[in-house]
Design a protein with these regions (language model features):
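Phosphate/NTP-binding elements of NTP-utilizing enzymes
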Residues: 1-233
């Protein structure tokens, strides 16, 4: 059983590292295709560069090469942000995918990572109770828990939406706005324009995608990022 001093030291270390690299590699696991099972989440250099970018900049864009793990890394980062969020200032995450299934996949990744985080990060009283079963963990952490929406006891919220003019309807004060497969979103500029006003002051925007020609949203945003006009692209 972990003691209070160690808890405080670990929490302080995890909180102070805004990239969440320490948190992810220390406490989270992910599926390792080579070993055919879940293993400790050891980040690759490209994934670390991505985390440094989104931690440092308000707007970031990343190329998602096949099996690069960028979406998974983003999900792990968001889970860490939620676990470390101040209940007096909870975060809201809006995930917009080119399909609802894609957006739901990211919410599912976030949920799975949240379940991995030690209970004492949330509440020491929970840690002292018998919360090892998934049912107890679910009731302890979540008010709403499904593939389209997560609402946690600390006030944080994660919402999955498909792209469209109403993608952000009913969601405000967004702390993290994430576009997954942004290059494949139809009428991408319009979707972006309608969703951007939901982002709160100091909020962040992340675009992730595999390239899809010279589309109006992702390609143009990436081009501007390379020219240092708007977004930052991790190198």
């Amino acid at each position: 059983m972990i003691d209070m001093r160690t808890m405080a030291e670990e929490y302080a270390r995890a909180y102070s590292d805004k990239t969440r690299i320490y948190f992810i590699e220390k406490y989270l696991s992910t599926f390792n295709a080579d070993k055919g099972k879940k293993t400790q989440f050891m980040l690759f250099p490209r994934q670390k560069a991505f985390l440094r970018s989104i931690a440092e900049h308000g707007r970031s864009i990343a190329i998602k090469h096949r099996q690069a793990g960028i979406t998974t890394t983003a999900g792990a980062f968001i889970a860490c942000e939620i676990a470390l969020a101040d209940p007096e200032s909870p975060i809201t995450v809006l995930v917009i995918g080119n399909t609802i299934d894609l957006a739901m996949q990211m919410v599912t990744k976030i949920r799975e990572f949240l379940f991995q985080i030690p209970l004492w990060f949330w509440d020491f009283e929970l840690y002292k109770k018998d919360m090892e079963s998934p049912i107890n963990r679910k009731s302890a952490l979540f008010k709403i828990c499904n593939t389209k929406e997560l609402i946690l006891k600390n006030g944080c919220r994660v919402v999955a939406r498909s792209s469209g003019p109403d993608a952000s309807r009913g969601v405000g004060g967004v702390t993290w706005l994430i576009f997954d497969e942004a290059a494949f979103i139809e009428n991408g500029k319009d979707v972006y324009a309608s969703a951007l006003p939901t982002v709160s002051t100091g909020g962040h925007v992340i675009m992730i995608s595999t390239p899809n020609g010279k589309d109006q949203l992702y390609y143009e945003t990436y081009r501007q990022a390379k020219a240092c006009l708007l977004y930052t692209s991790p190198s």
